[in-house]
Amino acid sequence: QIMAKTKKEKKEKKAGKRMKKKELVKALLDFFHIKQDEVLSLKYIFEQLHLTTHPLKMLCMDILSELSDDDYITEVDKHKYKLNNHGVEMTGTFQRKSNGKNSFIPEGGGDPIFVAERNSAHAMAGDKVRIAFYAKRRGREAEGEVIEILERANDTFVGTLEVAKSYAFLVTENRTLANDIFIPKEKLKGGKTGDKAIVKVVEWPDKAKNPIGQVIDILGKAGDNTTEMHAILAEFGLPYVYPASVEKAADKIPAEIPAEEYAKREDFRNITTFTIDPKDAKDFDDALSVRKLKDNLWEVGVHIADVTHYVTEGSIIDKEAEKRATSVYLVDRTIPMLPERLCNFICSLRPNEEKLAYSAIFEMTDKGEIKNSRIVHTVIKSDRRFTYEEAQQIIETKEGDFKEEILKLDALAKILREKRFAAGAINFDRYEVKFEIDEKGKPISVYFKESKDANKLVEEFMLLANRTVAEKIGRVPKSKKPKVFPYRIHDLPDPEKLDNLSQFIARFGYKLRTSGTKTDVSKSINHLLDDIQGKKEENLIETVSIRAMQKARYSVHNIGHYGLSFDYYTHFTSPIRRYPDMLVHRLLTKYLDLGGRSVSEQKYEALCEHSSSMEQIAANAERASIKYKQVEYMTERLGQTYDGVISGVTEWGLYVELNENKCEGMIPIRDLDDDYYEFDEKNYCLRGRRKKRTYSLGDAITIKVARANLEKKQLDFALIE
């Protein structure tokens, strides 16, 4: 009998080993969730979880004791337990990472909580979820388990179809989705292998590895230029076609100006007026007029397309514009906020056509002092459409059409600019990367577009008009409350980011003031931007400096604009391509012309928030389209060698920006195989463990183009020693 007992004990030990602690913890937690309203006795738990051996029962009691210590369950009576519902369930947002390190961000802030893939309940990035929170156990990170998906953030995905006989998959590069989407044959909408498609996830059964979806739209063949541009728009949830019903409504708007409209407006048709725009522009939002009033006194008019005269509040065109909130400028096309008939014809301030405008009129001295300003509805007629290049040539050669007017405006703009910088405005003088594209949309060359005097001339008068409009509404006596109005606001830089910037530039031998008055700091930033001009680190330091700044946004709560050093600022000058400018036009008319009462703060703040978020999405889509063209451009240049500079350092590798064309690619850390490299976040570098070699942000480096992945919009480089 003793022999038999020993065998039995051995068997029990084996059974005890068979179930790991981790598995039992999971089984217990799942069981408590299923029976969350019941009190469970120890005996009942043993029975239901088939814990028949002594070691397993002991392990179970240890875990129950830990869960009780962690306040996850309560021992309501001796050996009787109940799930604790207080404080262990939280609502928030699920964040999915491509490396499986998913997390949960609690509503109302708080530290992220790790959610293992097995506990994610197929949640997708951005989903609003409820989790059960396992408090910290000895030596273990706090963990959460998704117990309910409250709201899907995104259920449509863009990818490439792979079609088999009776089913298909959508293969997506979206890193927030762990698996491809399964599509039944009857839900394919005629899609074929190699088609780019938009697919909606309709269900994701508990036990299924893949979500199940249906095709919403076929965009075209992968690799085709229009298909790829539409795919980028769809990825960001932006529309790629214009609704026919809205186009139809625009077609009914008459282009003729009725006689009674002339009578209501100031007439500027006989005053020298012109537009200055990019050479490929069709939507001319703004025009400038100039005339001499008397010695040392000039009248300058900033005339803006009177879009809201044609687009009435609440109309079908207005609702579409509100939803879009901005035009989107991809690398080879514009996705307009308004129907084409309005933005390129009726509202566009085209030469030799009479147009309705909303204008800011200034009386200015030769020294740039503003003696008077008014905001009025006008009728104008542009005499000439200049490209920036043409206007620039007149400024440089002092010869050409309307040279006196252009040179006068240029001189006044330079004074306004000088005053702005003296007041503490920050001078980020960035160039843009542009592609020359053939008729098929293929990039054939890269060029840089920098801001010259002609651009700065237009910019200064737009800033002046925007500021003046904001002051007219916002600047009121202390005893009065200003009427509700959308402002363009920009907060002070984050002090921690400024400190990081200061430490970063020190290695290049530059200094930065991070404390003192607002103006002290901004002047110090300008000083830095001047110092780096023409240096090889210019682009890099400028990029890092911009990252230290806050993002400008729209709000009815005015805090001023730090970057421009204005106490009051708004957007008034681009109503063809920005919805906030349309709001500003409507409110100006209501307040200034009609003496109307203030509008709802809540409603307009919501419109401001929506516009700010759409502006960000549009900027991200624009960047993605540039990235796509960069990768496409470099596909033809595989194996070629380029000089560049390290533009980013992460734990997975080095980002390198090429000097010649500003294309950015990555050297994966796995390819740096001469040592084991560790990421030093504080010093923006990778450091070799044995040889101590470092690769730092800003280092000059030579690379070879190794791989180009258009699907991922990703370039891989190889280091050349």
Where are these regions (language model features)?
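A short macromolecule-binding patch
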Residues: 111-116, 177-183, 662-679
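Electropositive polyanion-binding surfaces
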Residues: 47, 198, 204-205, 231, ...
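Divalent-cation-assisted or electrostatically stabilized phosphate/pyrophosphate-binding catalytic cores
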Residues: 692-696
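Basic, polyanion-binding surface patches
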Residues: 507, 678, 683
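Charge-lined substrate channels and their catalytic hotspots, especially those that engage the 3′ end
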Residues: 4-301, 308-353, 632, 685-686, ...
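Short amphipathic alpha-helical "recognition" segments used for binding
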Residues: 9-16, 619, 626, 678
